[in-house]
């Protein structure tokens, strides 16, 4: 049973969705907010064959657990989820414990590499982050690291090309030193962590 009243029902052009066209989603006012460890049902926000840009697939639903909220800073240490300033259990402890003890996970078909797939960060499924999860009206200084982490989100919000060139971030034709997010985002995880396509692999989930 899904309670759509928490964040508000969504309105979109179903005919455009059936024709595999981009859709604009309008969300009605909700009665509350999500909490860590809530189970979320959502549309997959990336193209299935490529995760480098956001495109809502309103005909495809995923079910995952909310690990981090807008404004949180998330890490994975030794295979266990951590949110700074939060001491309670996050996600499926048994699955995290299994992953933490597993020798050579790639030999079992587990994909070790993670979002944002950039060797300069060195992230993997057992050592990941810190990753600040953007919240609406939160600003970040734009540099190479924040470009790597947030380029999909910024390109989606602004509907413009973003690139890192000559040590600077360009949005369209404009130089960007700081960016203020227009949306809230979440980090979600499947309970079967050894076999789950979730935020560890494709990135952050837009609130829409």
What are these regions (language model features)?
Residues 1-208:
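Soluble "head" domains of membrane/secretory-pathway proteins
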């Amino acid at each position: 049973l899904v309670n759509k009243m928490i964040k508000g029902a969504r309105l979109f052009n179903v005919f455009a969705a059936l024709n595999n066209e981009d859709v604009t989603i309008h969300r009605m006012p909700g009665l509350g907010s999500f909490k860590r460890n809530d189970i979320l049902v959502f549309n997959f926000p990336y193209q299935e064959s490529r995760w480098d840009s956001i495109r809502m697939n309103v005909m495809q639903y995923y079910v995952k657990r909310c690990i981090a909220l807008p404004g949180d800073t998330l890490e994975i240490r030794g295979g266990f989820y951590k949110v700074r300033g939060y001491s309670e259990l996050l996600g499926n402890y048994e699955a995290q414990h299994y992953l933490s003890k597993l020798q050579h996970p790639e030999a079992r078909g587990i994909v070790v590499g993670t979002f944002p797939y950039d060797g300069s960060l060195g992230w993997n499924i057992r050592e990941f982050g810190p990753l600040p999860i953007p919240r609406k009206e939160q600003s970040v200084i734009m540099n190479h690291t924040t470009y790597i982490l947030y380029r999909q989100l910024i390109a989606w919000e602004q509907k413009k090309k973003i690139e890192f060139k000559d040590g600077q971030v360009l949005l369209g034709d404009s130089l960007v030193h700081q960016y203020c997010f227009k949306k809230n985002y979440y980090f979600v995880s499947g309970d079967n962590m050894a076999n789950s396509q979730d935020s560890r692999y494709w990135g952050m989930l837009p609130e829409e």
